[in-house]
């Protein structure tokens, strides 16, 4: 059977009921209701290789610290609090992948486009009393195009090579906050293994990770 088709949908209900024994005035609750669809079409090119087109949705629900409305004042002019009206962050992804598995080479290549229309971000504003407020909102729109490759190659009976690499371009925008950022990112990891006499192994490996791109800038590497 060369063609394959799978589809599905699930419903998720999540609830939080947060209670503070010593500070009942800080108690709060939150419910999330989400419908999550998925679909995939695959085609077998041979007994050892296939291509696949798929769609899926991933959920990222905000945690307690993002939702907690209790106000914390670091100074008289600086207050921070969560936003109990936050909704589940939903990432939609469309992918095209190619797989081949042989005695010598295993390879997976994946091209993907994903987008989020309600990403959660922290932001600050100064109110009419001159107090700086720090909280969260579903204000980020993200588009990401990526390509990833994973390969395992048995060069000889005693020599093997593994490669994991990915690259992406991301565009983040927030109309509400008047901010935007974009750029390229990616990571690379490679490993060479050589079996030696006397049951010894020699392994060499290395990698690189590009800085993480967020609405506020870049961080890490």
Question: What is the predicted function of each stretch?
Answer:
Residues 1, 35-41, 51, 92-96, ...:
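Hydrophobic, lipid-facing positions within transmembrane beta-strands of outer-membrane proteins
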Residues 1-26, 32-38, 42, 47-92, 113-134, 158-169, 212, ...:
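Surface-exposed extracellular loop regions of Gram-negative outer-membrane beta-barrel proteins
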Residues 3, 41-43, 57, 98-100, ...:
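Residue-level signature of outer-membrane beta-barrel architecture
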Residues 13-21, 29-31, 59-65, 70, ...:
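Gram-negative outer-membrane beta-barrel proteins
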Residues 22-31, 83-87, 138, 213-220:
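Outer-membrane beta-barrel proteins
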Residues 44, 48-54, 106-109, 202-204:
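Acidic/polar loop patches that form or flank catalytic/metal-binding clefts of enzymes
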Residues 81-83, 87, 102-164, 169, ...:
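Outer membrane beta-barrel strand-and-loop segments of large Gram-negative receptors
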């Amino acid at each position: 059977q060369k063609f394959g088709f799978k589809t599905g949908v699930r419903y998720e209900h999540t609830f939080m009921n947060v209670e503070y024994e010593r500070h009942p005035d800080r108690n709060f609750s939150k419910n999330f209701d989400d419908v999550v669809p998925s679909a995939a079409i695959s085609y077998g090119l041979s007994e050892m290789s296939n291509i696949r087109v798929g769609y899926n949705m991933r959920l990222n629900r905000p945690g307690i610290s993002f939702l907690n409305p209790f106000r914390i004042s670091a100074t008289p002019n600086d207050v921070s609090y969560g936003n109990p009206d936050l909704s589940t962050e939903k990432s939609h992804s469309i992918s095209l992948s190619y797989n081949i598995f042989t005695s010598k080479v295993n390879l997976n290549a994946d091209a993907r486009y994903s987008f989020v229309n309600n990403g959660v971000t922290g932001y600050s504003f100064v109110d009419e009393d001159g107090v700086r407020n720090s909280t969260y909102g579903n204000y980020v729109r993200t588009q990401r195009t990526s390509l990833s490759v994973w390969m395992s190659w048995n060069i000889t009976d005693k020599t093997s090579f593994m490669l994991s690499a990915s690259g992406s371009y991301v565009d983040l925008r927030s109309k509400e906050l008047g901010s935007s950022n974009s750029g390229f990112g990616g990571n690379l990891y490679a490993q060479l293994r050589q079996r030696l006499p006397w049951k010894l192994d020699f392994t060499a490996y290395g990698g690189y990770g590009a800085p993480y791109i967020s609405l506020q800038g870049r961080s890490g590497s």
